[in-house]
Amino acid sequence: MKDMGEDRPGIGHSTNLVGLPTDLLASAWFNQAAPEIHIAGVREMNRSLFEMLAEAPDLESAGEAFYKYMIAMFGLDPEQQDHRPGQGGAVRRFHASYLRLLKGWGYDTNAKEGAVLKGWVESRFGLFPTFHREPITKFASKAWITYIEEKMTSRFHNNSIYVQLDLMYEFCQWALARFAAPGESALLLYRGVNDFTEHQMIERIDNRQVVVRMNNLVSFSSDRGVADCFGDTILETRVPVSKIVFFNTLLTSHPLKGEGEYLVIGGDYLVKASYL
């Protein structure tokens, strides 16, 4: 990892769990080449899940199987996630859930849930966030310290939350290859912005094409009309399938379904910018 005494963060750590240099993973070249990647050991340690998924006739059935597997593995029954007194007046312990993080992201990408999700990307893919509430310009900044504090919030780290997210990512990759985008290495997605506060301009190719450094986790939409609602500048790019963490039809019921939203791992993207 880059020396923490330096003022400006690099792109990320020198190591990650996907077996590629982080600089390469973050590069515009990677995002255009769109090779396949996996988080080390996740599928191997959860063979029963993927054997069960192989029997699913469609995405809806696969999503239901995944949901039930996660309930069994992590105790995610609704009764186990609230704070109402149980028998004898005891308070049930809150069980952190990947679905709770998605819900929080849907409300505010810069809330504590967003910090935990960005922290997971940093841990697994090696990429530092570039924005959390405000631009992260140096390690000693208030923005960096706030991010570190919030990504470590104990409320969300009592139930192997990063392992839950590992499984969600690998299920997403399996579902894209099997049902949602078979044979595709990248998908055309859109992001609406009002300015480039959250995006670092890396290179201008021409009047409409630029390379921008996206935050380590960002939201896109498959529907340009939806992206229009979030800003008067539309960024259009082809996102590697391997960088999609979650998409709107992955599960039959989840907090992000209404926006046709895709959660995407960041880095340097060649984008076409158009204006409303």
UniProtKB/Swiss-Prot annotation:
Gene Ontology BP annotations: nitrogen fixation
InterPro entries in UniProt: DRA_trans
Signal peptide from the UniProt entry: none
Keyword list, A-Z: Glycosyltransferase, NAD, Nitrogen fixation, Nucleotidyltransferase, Transferase
EC annotation from Swiss-Prot or TrEMBL: 2.4.2.37
Noted pH dependence of activity: Optimum pH is 7.0.
Catalytic activity: L-arginyl-[dinitrogen reductase] + NAD(+) = N(omega)-alpha-(ADP-D-ribosyl)-L-arginyl-[dinitrogen reductase] + nicotinamide + H(+)
Gene Ontology molecular functions: NAD+-dinitrogen-reductase ADP-D-ribosyltransferase activity; nucleotidyltransferase activity
Function: Involved in the regulation of the nitrogen fixation activity by the reversible ADP-ribosylation of the dinitrogenase reductase component of the nitrogenase enzyme complex. The ADP-ribosyltransferase (DraT) transfers the ADP-ribose group from NAD to dinitrogenase reductase. The ADP-ribose group is removed through the action of the ADP-ribosylglycohydrolase (DraG).
Oligomeric and partner information: Monomer.
Protein name (record): NAD(+)--dinitrogen-reductase ADP-D-ribosyltransferase
Native source species: Rhodospirillum rubrum
